[in-house]
């Protein structure tokens, strides 16, 4: 029996009607900063040790083209065909493994490399939506969180449509 190939990235996909992510907390009298989207897809992403730049296009292709959303006819379509907005959230906790009663994150990628891959992932998602005629016409957007920061999320979802995808 062949050895299982290691997981290099994990993404959690969640449909939304509205999502709002705090990317900067309030400080020194300044208001908090938020990113928000209307109907679309929230993508939580985590990279593991061994992940590299070659993996990013595959992840983007799969996640933006998977048919998870219902259109007005009840047909399942991708976020590109909907067309819908995308909110990307870096989520290192997706790399956790339960050991006893604690979570461990030994397989997560190093912070600097993870930040680099996350930036490439966001950029490629932006390019894919910008190159899609339906998305361009509808004016849909890619918004994203800040890598390495704690962030507050408010989410309105249209069902328990949460999917875990490993690469």
From Swiss-Prot:
Q: Name one GO biological process term.
A: tRNA metabolic process
What reaction does this enzyme carry out catalytically?
Answer: a D-aminoacyl-tRNA + H2O = a tRNA + a D-alpha-amino acid + H(+); glycyl-tRNA(Ala) + H2O = tRNA(Ala) + glycine + H(+); D-tyrosyl-tRNA(Tyr) + H2O = D-tyrosine + tRNA(Tyr); L-alanyl-tRNA(Thr) + H2O = tRNA(Thr) + L-alanine + H(+)
- What keyword terms does UniProt attach to this protein? Cytoplasm, Hydrolase, RNA-binding, tRNA-binding
Domain of life per record: Eukaryota
Keyword presence, Cell membrane: no
Q: Which compartments does it reside in?
A: Cytoplasm
Q: Name one Pfam family in it.
A: Tyr_Deacylase
Q: Which molecular function term from Gene Ontology is one that the record holds?
A: D-tyrosyl-tRNA(Tyr) deacylase activity
Q: Describe the subunit structure.
A: Homodimer.
Q: What is known of its domains?
A: A Gly-transPro motif from one monomer fits into the active site of the other monomer to allow specific chiral rejection of most L-amino acids except L-Ala. The trans conformation of the motif is maintained by Arg-150.
Q: Which family does it belong to?
A: Belongs to the DTD family.
PANTHER family membership: D-AMINOACYL-TRNA DEACYLASE 2, D-TYROSYL-TRNA TYR DEACYLASE
Q: Protein name, please? A: D-aminoacyl-tRNA deacylase 2
